[in-house]
């Protein structure tokens, strides 16, 4: 991994962006075991994709993430207390306690929330890209999907329309080998998603999804091309899901050997080791960055835990008045 192509400031920024969702998730897993959150869909081991993609985009370009893309939310610098409040069902959260997962978005940070079907976001991204193209705004739109999401019919519809209308949209496929517990080889026979994209007339690349520098540089190049000359791209990010579909489901259906192989490719450890090896950071600086992020997370958690719980009366503004005549 040659990091010398990127400025030191960029490398340090990517490092902090990588660490934040990892340390955030580790805290969430502790809270889950303590019963302070109800569920969690882990993206541990896949952070480089969310981080590299988000860092390469302009802040006013829309992103359609999924349930493992915490790095998109932290990468857009959403205050951590608001994210914790969302996942703990507090009033400060984006859904004000009415939902405790990733089913939320925010126009302020140009993020469109997902729904569990993991297909419709692709077509909606086409719509945003079409609006940008018609208004000549020179912006790109990014939509995430995965092995399972690509088996949805909307994957076909979205890619076909994007190709025919030459929309400035980039489809990110997190190819982690599984959809829930179904191996990819039981869903499709293509050797890679590049083959699928080419069938629609879409240019595509397959990259190491655990290499944040490669993800970042690839997205810089493709997003710049899409802004200058509207066209769609597909980026297959090869990675692996290091935990269960969600924490309650377990991982017994995945061979242990795969975990051992991919643990050696951990995106944080490999990037961190390269930064140290090439003299970009020292051990002391590394520890200082870790401590700073952990403190920020701890402060946010303590603030949100001290908030009052949602009470039923707070929901009434979403319903009809009880004394209304029908």
Predicted regions and their residues:
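Acidic, proline/serine/threonine- and glycine-rich low-complexity intrinsically disordered segments
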Residues: 312-314
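Cofactor-binding active-site loop characterized by glycine-rich and histidine/acidic residues
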Residues: 26, 30-165, 183-189, 194, ...
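Glycine-rich ThDP/TPP pyrophosphate-binding loop and its adjacent helix/strand module
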Residues: 111-299, 303-306
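Cofactor-/ligand-binding subdomain signature composed of acidic, glycine-rich
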Residues: 1-38, 59
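Conserved small/polar residues in nucleotide/adenosyl-binding loops
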Residues: 316-322
């Amino acid at each position: 991994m040659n990091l010398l192509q990127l400025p030191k400031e960029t490398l340090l920024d990517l490092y902090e962006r990588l660490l934040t969702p990892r340390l955030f998730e580790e805290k969430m897993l502790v809270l889950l075991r303590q019963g302070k959150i109800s569920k969690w869909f882990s993206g541990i081991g896949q952070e480089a994709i969310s981080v590299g993609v988000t860092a390469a985009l302009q802040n006013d370009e829309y992103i359609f993430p999924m349930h493992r893309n915490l790095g998109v939310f932290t990468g857009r610098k959403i205050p951590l207390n608001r994210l914790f409040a969302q996942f703990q069902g507090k009033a400060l959260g984006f859904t004000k306690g009415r939902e405790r997962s990733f089913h939320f978005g925010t126009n302020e940070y140009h993020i469109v929330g997902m729904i569990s079907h993991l297909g419709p976001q692709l077509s909606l991204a086409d719509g945003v890209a079409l609006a940008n193209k018609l208004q000549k705004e020179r912006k790109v739109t990014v939509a995430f999907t995965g092995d399972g999401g690509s088996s949805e019919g909307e994957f076909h519809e979205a890619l076909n329309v994007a190709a025919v209308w030459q929309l400035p949209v980039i489809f990110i496929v997190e190819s982690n080998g599984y959809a829930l517990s179904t191996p990819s080889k039981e869903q499709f026979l293509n050797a890679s998603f590049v083959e699928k994209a080419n069938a629609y007339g879409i240019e595509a690349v397959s990259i190491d999804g655990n290499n944040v520098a490669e993800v970042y540089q690839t997205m810089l190049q493709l997003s710049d091309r899409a802004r200058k000359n509207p066209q769609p791209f597909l980026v297959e990010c090869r990675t692996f899901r290091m935990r269960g579909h969600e924490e309650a489901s377990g991982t017994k259906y995945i061979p242990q050997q795969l975990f051992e192989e991919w643990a050696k490719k951990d995106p944080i450890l490999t990037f961190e080791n390269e930064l140290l090896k090439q003299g970009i950071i020292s051990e002391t600086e590394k520890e200082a960055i870790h401590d700073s992020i952990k403190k920020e997370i701890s402060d946010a958690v303590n603030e949100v835990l001290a908030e009052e719980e949602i009470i039923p009366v707070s929901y009434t503004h979403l319903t009809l008045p009880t004394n209304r005549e029908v």
